[in-house]
Amino acid sequence: TQGVKEITLLGQNVNAYFYEQKDETIDFVTLLEYISEVPGVERIKYTTSHPKEFSDRLIASYRTMDKLVDHVHLPVQSGSDKILESMKRGYTRIQYLKIIKDLKAARSSVSISSDFIVGFPGETEADFEETISLVDEVNFDGSFSFMYSPRPGTPAAALPDHVPLNVKKDRLARLQAKLSKNALHYNQLMVGNEYEVFVEGLSKKDSSKLSGRTSNNKVVNF
């Protein structure tokens, strides 16, 4: 491994990985197990995972595989079952929350980040409030959020009841304020504790300092 201490598996729906050969079947967890046995590797990351493919076996690996970092990025997109179905996400709000609950039970220190889209066609204020309530319930540690914008030729572009731009902007601002507040609270809980930091290079803000990340994906400059 030539001194490599951290490996990141990158892919869209990366946890859906599956490889089959004559005498062996390798799923995502098996791949993680193989990597964890590589001498010198101390941290394993992956992104981006999909809730539909987040198996009980993958959740259980957070009990046994110490090299998996304390962070999972698990895009939910919406807290409304109606919108999730319209998006064809393949899971419900309850199913998503169960994954989070089981992950926290497997490893209480794991932090969760996510992706959100507001203003998807047909999203009502009630649907949006379900997203807000999901954010309150999970307490995400940082997330990415966007306004829906139609792309010609996609199924969503042909859906009725497109949300006005001013409404989308308002909902995005409200969601981001909530997400930022939760992320700040999470950061404040870390104050006064010690964390191992893997150095990634020089600080972008001050080249006289180093920059790295904690196991729960916090950037640290020192």
Residue ranges and their predicted role:
Residues A158-F222:
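Terminal RNA-binding accessory module
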